[in-house]
Amino acid sequence: MNHDQSHALFSRAQQLLPGGVNSPVRAFKSVGGEPFFVERADGAYLYDVDGNRYIDYVGSWGPMIVGHNHTAVRQAVKKAIDNGLSFGAPCAAEVTMAETITRLVPSCEMVRMVNSGTEATLSAIRLARGATGRNRIVKFEGCYHGHGDSFLVKAGSGMLTLGVPTSPGVPAGLSELTLTLPYNDFEAATALFEQQGDDIAGLIIEPVVGNANCIPPRDGYLQHLRELCTKHGTLLIFDEVMTGFRVALGGAQAHYGITPDLTTFGKIIGGGMPVGAYGGRRELMQQIAPAGPIYQAGTLSGNPVAMAAGLAMLELIQQPGFHADLAERTARLCAGLEAAAADAGVVVTTTCVGAMFGLFFTSEKVETYAQATACDIPAFNRFFHAMLDQGVFLAPSAYEAGFLSSAHDDAVIEATLAAARVAFKAAKG
């Protein structure tokens, strides 16, 4: 593939943008090489500025569940734009969005729109602290909840890729209020709550870890956390920025049958546009200003264009069989990847929940952060570049989940597996 135009753009970007990008993982620092620059996207494909086409398993990091540039979403955005971009005042679409979310996710009796997943998680933590009168929060090793100071303690995603467990610039006094647990460890959670449970305002978790690759919860683990939180008066917060409306119509909480106190959502409710939301029980949400004393605000929150895009997308994914079909195709992709690896003499394991999947270069079933970090990262990097050379774009980090959309049809999956049969041979080194 020719990448002359992308190389020229990256050279210019490095002079003006830190690392040449506006979000760290895009720089390919973990896998090596340089990123390609996207010109357009359609369906299951990205097209770069040099005219190369890629099957896309990043999906703008999750929200493109109906594929890129879907006609219904695009038309909804065009119609909204005809009436203006942002009002700084209430609009009908944000009410319809709230009605839709509360109907599809019953644990959210009320919601507040924000502009990103990070805003949603930061706001949820503030609400948990304000509602309980406590200061400590609990998160999990390898889980990423945005770039808020409270979360950059043993974080995942870009932080894990960079190998930095905590970020400079986070005050020690603040980071000391964040307690970190190993994911999927029943005993550690029990012990922590026995020692400090009555001081913990909230426990925030990705119900399926998507920022240390894709790690599902062990049987009964989420229920165990629910019981601990209930016993100690701690708010259970599900970060469904990745899993919401993707692993099931009602998110991971519907898939696993667990009811959190608060839930955060991200860009998927904007059809890929910048948006987020958090919601929960009415008595909690009523404590947010102006109904209550816990302050949170945003000029662009609930803006009509993002709401229109999100509503169009949410209507599409409510079609009968949508999620079951996506889950079946994701499982078929994972089975095909394992078979292709075995044929090449490469040891891999896969995970999948709904339309999320993970690929690990290890013989172990990966259930913990420690297992994820012990995988053969150089082998993944070789595999990544071999797939990219054949026009398949995986996340440029061994610590990120993959995503399918309804545009990933049988032909796309078979083309992916054909590329994988070649790429696994390159991964052997």
Swiss-Prot record:
InterPro entries, per the entry: 4pyrrol_synth_GluAld_NH2Trfase (IPR004639), Aminotrans_3 (IPR005814), Aminotrans_3_PPA_site (IPR049704), PyrdxlP-dep_Trfase (IPR015424), PyrdxlP-dep_Trfase_major (IPR015421), PyrdxlP-dep_Trfase_small (IPR015422)
Reaction equation(s) it catalyzes: (S)-4-amino-5-oxopentanoate = 5-aminolevulinate
PTM sites of type N6-(pyridoxal phosphate)lysine: 267
Pfam family, one: Aminotran_3
GO molecular function, one term: pyridoxal phosphate binding
Cofactor(s) this protein cannot do without: pyridoxal 5'-phosphate
Quaternary assembly: Homodimer.
UniProt-listed NCBIfam families: hemL, PRK00062.1
Record-given protein name: Glutamate-1-semialdehyde 2,1-aminomutase
Taxonomic placement: Bacteria, Pseudomonadati, Pseudomonadota, Gammaproteobacteria, Lysobacterales
Gene that this polypeptide is encoded by: hemL
